[in-house]
Swiss-Prot record:
Modified how: N-glycosylated.
InterPro entries: AB_hydrolase_fold, PAF_acetylhydro_eukaryote
Cysteines joined through disulfide linkages: none
Keyword entries, A-Z: Glycoprotein, HDL, Hydrolase, Lipid degradation, Lipid metabolism, Phospholipid degradation, Phospholipid metabolism, Secreted, Signal
Active site: S271, D294, H349
GO molecular function annotation: 1-alkyl-2-acetylglycerophosphocholine esterase activity; calcium-independent phospholipase A2 activity; phospholipid binding
Chief location bin: secreted
The species this protein was found in: Cavia porcellus
Protein name: Platelet-activating factor acetylhydrolase
Amino acid sequence: MAPPKLHTLFCLSGFLALVHPFDWRDLDPVTYIQSSVWIQRIQSELLITSFGHTTIPKGNGPYSVGCTDLMSGYTNQSSFLRLYYPSQDNDFPDALWIPNEEYFQGLTETLGASSFLGKLLKLLYGSVKVPAKWNSPLKTGEKYPLIIFSHGLGAFRSIYSAIGIELASHGFIVAAVEHRDESAAATYYFQDAPAAESGNRSWIYYKVGNLETEERKRQLRQRGEECSQALSWLLSIDEGEPVKNVLDLNFDIQQLKGSLDRSKVAIIGHSFGGATVIQTLSEDQRFRCGIALDPWMFPVGEDVHSKIPQPLFFINSEYFQSANDTKKIEKFYQPQKERKMIAVKGSVHHNFVDFTFATGKIIGQMLSLKGKIDSEVAMDLINKASLAFLQKYLGLDKNFDQWNSLMEGDDENLIPEFTIPTTMQSSTGTEQRNPD
């Protein structure tokens, strides 16, 4: 994920320019803007100028979806996950999309913007919910395939819910890792048990700056280790080992005992998370296959392609990948190895992220959160192609093979492998806007 483009959404010019101007020097802007009149004015102007929906789509599968957070222990060495899973009870509240004020602060610090912007973001998006039932009990009696999900640069565990919810609605348990490598906009841990009991969080924010290749590679190695660690912890829960969720939420973690199909484990990630998919597959053979969503290839090692025997699927946006990225991807195509690649026509890098649903058409396209393709159509293609791939290479007894043609790019809104346009990027892979 390229933070400058992602967070441009939250610049004041996107919506404050549309309301009646006032002189910020003569008042406290936060107090002023918190009046109900101004809240309604800003929100209504945002909706009027967006001309589109602002909700994250529900899952289309046969299962209801639950959601909870899990933390395996204390210190920043623990695993921190958002879990999406098939649920047996809908009589629970929907989960909060962005769960803490500090995440808004992290987004603004990633941008290098003022703290006021974070308060404004919280005002506008702090109460947004996702269509997954918070702490709803797991639907027991089945063994579910497991997906570990890795977020992009400047993101965090909860903002890929459109993907997590859709997969869970089709019978997967999805564990979205929140990385502690200073690539998340924000994350936290508890130093010890007293800190957890008192709610004293220790926060880690995005490491701002033009990081060199070696630092990105260090982060990538850590991310891969965190994905493997999350898998090991979930498998130990499945085995019935005594574990505790230090978040102490109203979710019985023992429900997960015996719930995983341990032979059917995959990894999915977007942008830096796509690079993490590649890194993790090269180090951990427990993952049977992987899906790299518009991967940020800059930190990927030159020889890692030779270390991945598992099937690998690249699903790209139309214009994010540079010519150098495509050359790196081509190296993964080797004899006797299962590789597939498609791109979603008219899509941009952030069509894979929930933020594509957080604003309507005009503002979304202006700020590169939406492409020319409808966001729901793009997400539907991404999810269906992923499901078809997962069925084929995890050996699932489902009906996802009805979408096998999507893996080959056989759709008017898809581009088959190696006919995908490339774009100009900076040396660190930051997306740049292409001329139409």
